[in-house]
């Protein structure tokens, strides 16, 4: 089974085609369709939206006839929202009678899914494993049989796809073991010594970054669903109105958001299998305004390495 996160308004609806229309949702659905055709069975597909993009997302996919996917197996749900506060601890308002609310982080997907009753639906359907993936990586393989098989064969509670870092300072979290538990160390938590630490073979020790494509045992997700995930405080630019009703759209961070993170769900598992994939074939996130992951980025390679 699959769950997708559409964190930014209209992100999945973005047209990334060069010579023809090609939408991010279309790419992801095509990737799932590969497995559907091989398996000869439809896979339940759960798509998470925010309050702000729910109507746009559902209307867009309906208009596009779900890019050929069986509509009976596509289920939408809204992510839970959390308030923001300014640096003085004051709640920010979006309207005179409405708090400024934001999605509660990428760790909120399973609790949000359960609020819609989809946990019971999965139990009745006999779904044993659930893939959680981000909307922005258009090349990722979803429910890749090799990945699924490796995780099941390992006996682990979950698995995470990883890629070798492009360079030691790449801003990605690293899947490792901490006190016998699976742990993801975020790039901003790593010291310079950790970043450049090498093993006995001269390879970087913290060299495999997660790409936000995880496979979880559903019964383990159910077991941790009652536990509260820790809240992470994140500084963000949050539009708001002041006491006079004047709208403000800050250009620099002005507030704290409180988010749960999927990395804490991984930490709650007994074990996790890191599964390396080829970043040139399976990792193309579209998220940064400029730089390596931006939409207009072109590879310096003289040939297209991403050809299959």
Regions found by a protein language model. Name each.
Residues 128-129, 139-143, 150, 154-299:
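Catalytic core of tubulin tyrosine ligase-like
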Residues 1-5, 79, 277-279:
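Short loop/turn segments at strand-loop or loop-helix junctions that form parts
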Residues 10-127:
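Conserved N-terminal catalytic core of the sugar/cofactor nucleotidyltransferase
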Residues 1-6, 86, 191-192, 233-236:
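Active-site-adjacent bridging/hinge elements
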Residues 9-10, 55-61, 87, 141-145, ...:
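A short acidic (Asp/Glu
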Residues 133-134:
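Active-site acidic Asp-centered loop
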Residues 3-11, 297-305:
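Conserved small/polar residues in nucleotide/adenosyl-binding loops
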